[in-house]
Amino acid sequence: ILNDANDPMGVEKEAIDSVWLGCNGVIYLTNRVYSPTSYVSVSYPAMINETMHILYWGIKQLQYNVYLNSLNSYYSFFIPTNNSLLEYVDPVSYGKSQTQLYRFHYDPTQVDENMRVWASVWNYDTVAGEVTDSIGEVRDPGRIRNRLKDILDTHIVIGNVEDGHKYYRTKGGMEIRVNNVADGANGMTVEGSYQINEGNPIN
């Protein structure tokens, strides 16, 4: 028996009380509850937490739940909150004369789910570290998905960051350094190349 991620559910014969044949499948009555994979996967906090709606929208739009829900693989997932996505320096703008910063927003009132996430765009002074002029908005779902894909790919590690090493490679190929894992929220730090160069780890 496979679950909604097409992984074996691990249902033992002893757990099956009754079986019915339907016109399009089989119904098993079990004497225990099996959780949907989305409730036990690494993306679960983003699904239920209102402060993480933006990233969960990206997970659904990009269909990342297909493999994040897989119980045959192990992932470490660092989930940015909505507030942290107000300071995303657009890597596409690095080749421009003016670096730009995206501030992502979530609008739950939008009937069209594809339009619920949008971004205001600002000029950003990389030397002073200051946000300057507002230069417009991005409401094209394709561009928003593109930027969120970059964020997701740099926040997913295939493997366990609690295995005793310090350096890991993200799904997007970026190297990160993880320290003080055993301290959890009280002291664990994560650094990409920018944080390492600036001596400013994220905790």
Q: What function would you assign to each model-found segment?
A:
Residues 1-203:
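Mature, structured domains of secreted/extracytosolic soluble proteins
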